[in-house]
Regions:
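An alpha-beta-alpha
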Residues: 19-81, 99-100
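Periplasmic-binding protein-like
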Residues: 1-7, 46-51, 97-107, 113, ...
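Extracytoplasmic/secreted cell-surface and envelope-processing proteins
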Residues: 12-16, 31, 56-60, 86, ...
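Structural motif
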Residues: 30-33, 79-93, 161-163
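Extracellular/periplasmic periplasmic-binding protein-like sensory domains
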Residues: 114-177
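Beta-alpha junction/loop-to-helix N-cap segments that form part of ligand/metal-binding clefts
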Residues: 1-15, 23, 78-87, 107-111, ...
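Loop/turn elements at helix/coil->beta-strand transitions in domains of secreted/extracellular proteins
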Residues: 1-3, 16-19, 42-47, 70-74, ...
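Active-site-proximal beta-strand/loop segments in catalytic clefts of secreted hydrolases
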Residues: 6-9, 24-26, 50-54, 77-81, ...
């Protein structure tokens, strides 16, 4: 039975399976795009990268980002399962001299990181992968004027007007969408 994944960005998912396909980009692509964006948009020469220990998505996307950015120009840290206080990581990022903060982590961790980054006035753009493309994150960032946030997204503006209008209406109708 053929299967089509719509959000499975890990390149390992379809390897060795002739019946499993994807329609989205993969992590090596989004990691490279985000690294290039950091360098091109912000003239970043140093990046702080934060991943969840043992999480294939988080660690993998950090690795793809660092490879494209230049590993020698990245500060890389991991946090363990169950972490709720990210203030030491935000402090570490601020003290590292980094120009951007990259954290491809879960929505739950992201909301906490955003709060703690705002509290400490992080002072650098925050970048993340497709998991942060969520109304939960938009709500968490709301009212935090000192947060400068950029994420990758599967949505392409202007693809089809008949699809775009009702999709925007649906996505904005409920913050859990």
């Amino acid at each position: 039975v053929p299967a089509i994944g719509v959000t499975c960005t890990n390149p390992q998912i379809t390897i060795g399976n002739d019946h499993y396909f994807r329609i989205c980009f993969i992590d090596p692509f989004q990691g490279t795009v985000l690294a290039n964006f950091a360098k091109d948009q912000f003239s970043a020469t140093k990046a702080y990268c934060l991943a969840k220990q043992g999480d294939d998505y988080s660690v993998g996307l950090c690795n793809y980002f660092m490879k494209a950015f230049g590993e020698e120009n990245c500060v890389y840290e991991v946090f363990p399962e169950g972490t709720s206080d990210y203030s030491s990581y935000v402090t570490s990022a601020k003290n590292s001299g980094a120009d951007v903060f990259f954290a491809p982590v879960s929505i739950e961790a992201a909301a906490l990181i955003l709060d703690q980054a705002a509290t400490q006035d992080l002072g650098m753009p925050m970048l993340a992968g497709d998991t942060w493309d969520s109304n939960v994150i938009t709500e968490a960032a709301k009212g935090k004027s000192n947060i400068d946030l950029y994420v990758t997204t599967f949505y392409q503006e202007g693809g089809n007007a008949e699809f775009d209008a009702p999709f925007k209406e649906w996505i904005n109708s409920d913050s859990t969408n």
